[in-house]
UniProtKB/Swiss-Prot annotation:
The gene is PLBD1. It comes from Bos taurus (Bovine). The lineage of its organism: Eukaryota, Metazoa, Chordata, Craniata, Vertebrata. The keyword Protease does not apply. This is Phospholipase B-like 1. Residues 1-35 form the signal peptide. One of its GO terms (biological process) is phospholipid catabolic process. Its EC number is 3.1.1.-. The maturation cleavages that produces chains A and B are required to open the putative substrate binding pocket. Both chains A and B remain associated in the mature protein. It is an enzyme of class 3 (hydrolase). Pfam families: Phospholip_B. Glycans are attached at N68, N305, N363, N408, N523. Exhibits a weak phospholipase activity, acting on various phospholipids, including phosphatidylcholine, phosphatidylinositol, phosphatidylethanolamine and lysophospholipids. However, in view of the small size of the putative binding pocket, it has been proposed that it may act rather as an amidase or a peptidase. Keywords: Disulfide bond, Glycoprotein, Hydrolase, Lipid degradation, Lipid metabolism, Lysosome, Signal.
Amino acid sequence: MSRHSQDERLGLPQPPALLPLLLLLLAVAVPLSQAGVYYATAYWMPTEKTIQVKNVLDRKGDAYGFYNNSVKTTGWGILEIKAGYGSQSLSNEIIMFAAGFLEGYLTAPHMDDHFTNLYPQLIKKRSMLNKVQDFLTKQDQWTRENIKYYKSDPFWRHADYVMAQMDGLFAGATKRAVLEGKKPMTLFQIQFLNAIGDLLDLIPSLSPTKNSSLKFFKRWDMGHCSALIKVLPGFENIFFAHSSWYTYAAMLRIYKHWDFNIVDKDTSSSRLSFSSYPGFLESLDDFYLLSSGLVLLQTTNSVYNKTLLQHVVPQSLLAWQRVRVASMMANNGKQWAEVFSKYNSGTYNNQYMVLDLKKVNLNHSLDEGTLYIVEQIPTYVEYSEQTAVLRRGYWPSYNIPFHEKVYNWSGYPILVKKLGLDYSYDLASRAKIFRRDQGKVTDMESMKYIMRYNNYKQDPYSKGDPCNTVCCREDLNSHSPSPGGCYDTKVADIYLASKYKAYAISGPTVQGGLPVFHWSRFNKTLHEGMPEAYNFDFITMKPIL
């Protein structure tokens, strides 16, 4: 780090002066009393090959942005970063490093909280920690070796951008911790956070059990979610939304807007807005609005055929890395699927919905290529063009594989035989609820409503179970309540997406008079940095820099 005058020495990020603060608050619609907006600019020092940070918003800097720490008042932090638009010309790798550095610097305290909260949810034994650490170390090494070896390959070049961003994230978080006299996070902890989704399959693959009971698994513990794409009858508009399900320990949230000036003939998207978490260089949910005109949604498919998990090896790219590379490179759904399919790790096995808004002609047609469905299991990725289904009105997604081969190989037919039709694609409770209620979606408010829907006491399809519905509340389970379920919803349409805008709400649903979730009922579950109660409204997410 180069030495500068006393005035320029790196301090902690400070709240901004009142005028820019007011401008920010006007743009993000947060009352002044709730403000905790911090901004900073990162400068690449080419001689020293380091980053210097100043607590100013300088458009000539190599990366600049702000973090609105409004988690306690809206349920969301908001991060916006622009990189590569400064006065000096930088390589794409340095731009990505600077962007990662600034994010780490601005959000390090919440990154630390998020790791604290999630670690005990995933790691129950020290022996498992060692196995996970060993796997992630080997996987990281394999990835970096390939990046070096295949320098001229566009795929690996983009993998390099993602890894440079992660290296920056680590360096920036370290800088902030040192300044505050705190113990910095390790690189493994950063890798662990980014691989949370992958760990949901990696951990079972590292600890094969002889007879895992099918009856007592929780619906939310594998990161299950609900998603819906809805087209109005005359193609007047297209809505899309996602509600995340996982442990409530993951409810420390950041909505992110990134705009990176990456100059590469093989890059289709370097600007994106997405729902995320502290320290994550991916959405995890997934809910992405990309500058290529693609929208990406995802729900998780459990793999009940445990023999498939034997094929998980570190010589592969994790799902979060492949999602980032595919989302940067692809200009359409088919390309996205092709890129994503490479070096499949068989971890975080999901259904991805890739919606191409460039193919949507409102009031006229949904052209071929509007919707691609991509599904992954270990050793296999299947994708298909499914616009014909969407033309009939909607595409629902609810944690059961669509493609027959993926469904069969994952072990669902056996599950249906043992546990009934709730695990079939056509007759799962959410399949029935979406089929019944999607026709009521006519505008943004009704789309929000269906995605927060939980009427488990009266709805015959829920059978009295607070998780047999669109927005699960396992904490309301009368037999064995636990702090998990559906804890957010993000909604947008074609008009909002063109401006990188969306509406987002954080916390378990209270629709129809359901009780507000309070952490006091589940104090043994770590929830550092979170509000005690979750009773927030939808807020508008939009970039303002």
